[in-house]
Amino acid sequence: DVAVGGVNDALARALELTDAEPLCEDGLGRVGQLSEPLALAEFARFVCRRLGCNGVRWADAGRPVSRVAVGGGACGDEIDAVIAAGCDTFVTSDLTYHQFLDAAPKGINLIDAGHFPTEDPVCAKIVAYLEKEFPQLIIIKTTSHKEVIQYFVEGE
């Protein structure tokens, strides 16, 4: 989404990105910095832990992770904007095979963290907002809306 304080700001905060700014002119996505560069495998584990993912799909362009773009939900079509913003890594969801295939030659690490996990971080903020605006109501975040995709990894 493009809302200030919305899905993408919450995702950037969840991944501890600093100096987050919009990725696209229309406000979609966010770009920020890690406090220190990480290897992609280490960052992928960090993303899993921070977003509560069952797993992530990733493609390694051979670059350390430092300047990161995020797009909650399906933002794979924004890879050119990620490149233009000088990012080395893009965290989003619903990426296609060809987007993964094309990423490494363009110098972009990709992490597909799943649609639900990349949008869910905003829910706590929405609950807090509703509790503040409507103190007479009891606001409960649903537990039935959750990640539905499971992964089977050979050898586990």
At which residue positions do the language-model features occur?
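Active-site catalytic microenvironments in core metabolic enzymes, especially phosphate/sugar-handling
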Residues: 1-156
